[in-house]
Amino acid sequence: MNIPPELTFEVLVRLPLKSLARFRSMCKEWKLVIDSEFFRDCFMSHNSSSVSWSIIQTRPHKLTLEIVGHHGCKTWGLTRSPGSLVSFFAETTIRKLQVLACTDGLVLLYVESCVGTPMYYVGNPLFQEWFRIPLRPKYTSQNVEKLRNHERFSDSGLVTKMQSGIVVSYKVVWLIAHTFAQVDFAIYSSNTGEWEIKNVTCLHSAYWFSHHKSIALNGILHWLSNLTGSFLAYDFYGGHHDACSIIYFPDNGKDYELPRFRRTITTSEGSIVYFNEFGGNANRKVRVWRLVKYTDGPEAWQLFWEASLASVTKLGIDYFPVVMHPLKSEIIYLWSRNKKGMVLFNLRTHVFSLHKESEDERKCMDGCTLSFNWCNEYMETVHRYFSPSFQGGPNLLLASQYVLPRWLSRLPRPQPSN
């Protein structure tokens, strides 16, 4: 029986990506429909805000960094959390594996063979596509080991270029910060399959160390530094810039209230976001700013939420901020130590929900199912960082988000040279 093309389209566009990936490989006609730009645009318009994602930790180096997973969302239709699907099959026996970065559905790995050979891989774990990144020319295993032990070297940079929701290229970034306002970037491009070196001015390079993790967004890497009032950024797809941007937090300066928690950054709805608590006792408020311009002036930030935390404080005040929801900017995530659970707080309605690791998995505010993976243990190791007695220390990125793509993005690969 021949099925009309219009009916085929209507059926396929309502299926989750997990099913589309399977049907795409079963039938040539279905593959042609699914691969069309029109189908992709229709699918993404129907699934604009329901994507599986994870909260990942930034300290221990394990293959699965996920501490909180969101699955059962409409777009992918996963029955397990995204972190449980990440696996890597090495081409040789290995003795060490580290997850260096996760962004836009791609993962950057550092691997050591049983004889100590260093290897870097970029992959799409959902499709089990992995590509080994060649080392820089003339670099030996000893060179890489020496660099990785340098206190101002970092090999954890991964940025992407997106078009219509699809990753079309990526760059792996190594950096070494010098003491005199200079940073060297070594950049591997999936477009060229080659490395390039950039020497960039960075006035705060003396306060930049290898343990500082970055957040990638729109081709830009963002780093917190030992200077608590600001952070650094560099655009790897935005042209030939010879200097890093320095962005000061919006509550920095003597004219502002002292925030309760140490400053950090997160992402939501395509923007860098900063939120913190202000006030005290019965007047606790959360303020949320969105970064709108990469400059060092007050016009860099837009205050877009200010909400009372009176309802949350009924659980006690022993909590601290974790991340914002990456797709819904009205939802923030807080960890409650006394309740040993994740608090999801809606800034618009002031409604909150408490989710505990000891409870059965259940739906949360975005319609996804919440699952935990040693979250309580991790939060216990980092909670002291948020204590007022630590306010004089550096800012650190302790949690980030890993969001699955909204479409079937394959892993970009360098074109073979003629």
From Swiss-Prot:
It comes from the Eukaryota. Signal peptide: none annotated. Coiled coil: none annotated. Residues 1-42 form the F-box domain. Pfam families: b-prop_At3g26010-like, F-box. Transmembrane segments: none annotated. This is Putative F-box protein At3g23950. It comes from Arabidopsis thaliana (Mouse-ear cress).
